[in-house]
Amino acid sequence: MSDEVQPGFVRVRLDLSYDGTEFSGWAKQAAGRRTVQGEIEDALRTVTRSGETTYELTVAGRTDAGVHARGQVAHVDLPGELWAEHQEKLLKRLAGRLPKDVRVWSLTEAPSGFNARFSAIWRRYAYRVTDNTGGVDPLLRSHVLWHDWPLDVDAMNEAARRLVGEHDFAAYCKKREGATTIRTLQELSLVRGDDGVITATVCADAFCHNMVRSLIGALLFVGDGHRGPDWPGKVLAVGVRDSAVHVVRPHGLTLEEVGYPADELLAARNKEARNKRTLPAAGCC
């Protein structure tokens, strides 16, 4: 994937939100499954009268089926003439064409070197769970997990602090051949709101598959007393998947925001993000 925009094209940044309940994830799939990418690309093709031509989106975070996004970012390269013709009315036309569970909030010409995926320096997710004896507020049922054991948020935060930093998160990721599982977890913290809903904030430079939901699964085991606060850190250190770590359900997870560097740093960030990371050797640094 090149960061160079082809001659005659304009790179456009999209800021968008969606309720993931009825989607089979972000990425287009076979067999006609409904996806966020598919809906937006279809709408874009229709409102720009592009016939059979599909302009493919690149996204900051490829969310799984059932996962929501409040602050997702994508980009698309459009022919300059098409962008000039439709720019002023494109946002409103998309609003009229897109289904109600996905919205595009802004369309802007991206700065040189911008790549929605590789330019990002952090992604921030929130996972919401309640241990309310009566269950989840019906109005929040598609966005909050119900855990039927009382949760000790202080114990969960104690466990979370031991996971922050640069580590190999292989124990919390679904393995992909040739892909690194080294990530820098910048924040992992939990707060109980006045309504009893516990919000876990999870921020990292990037995430591997199932990482956020696996981390939350481990912390829930600590919170309900089935494991001690040191257990998630021990699992991390072993470096292999532990069958006791559950991948929690997707509907409690929302991509809240994606961060990018200043425009002049985009090219360097793109190059850095493509490098396969390794941890320092033992005794080094």
Curated annotation (Swiss-Prot):
It comes from the Bacteria. GO terms for molecular function: RNA binding; tRNA pseudouridine(38-40) synthase activity. Gene3D superfamilies: Pseudouridine synthase I, catalytic domain, C-terminal subdomain, Pseudouridine synthase I, catalytic domain, N-terminal subdomain. Substrate binds at Y125. Keywords: Isomerase, tRNA processing. The keyword Isomerase applies. Its EC number is 5.4.99.12. GO terms for biological process: tRNA pseudouridine synthesis. The active site is at D64. The keyword Isomerase applies. It catalyses: uridine(38/39/40) in tRNA = pseudouridine(38/39/40) in tRNA. It is an enzyme of class 5 (isomerase). Belongs to the tRNA pseudouridine synthase TruA family. Homodimer. Formation of pseudouridine at positions 38, 39 and 40 in the anticodon stem and loop of transfer RNAs. This is tRNA pseudouridine synthase A.
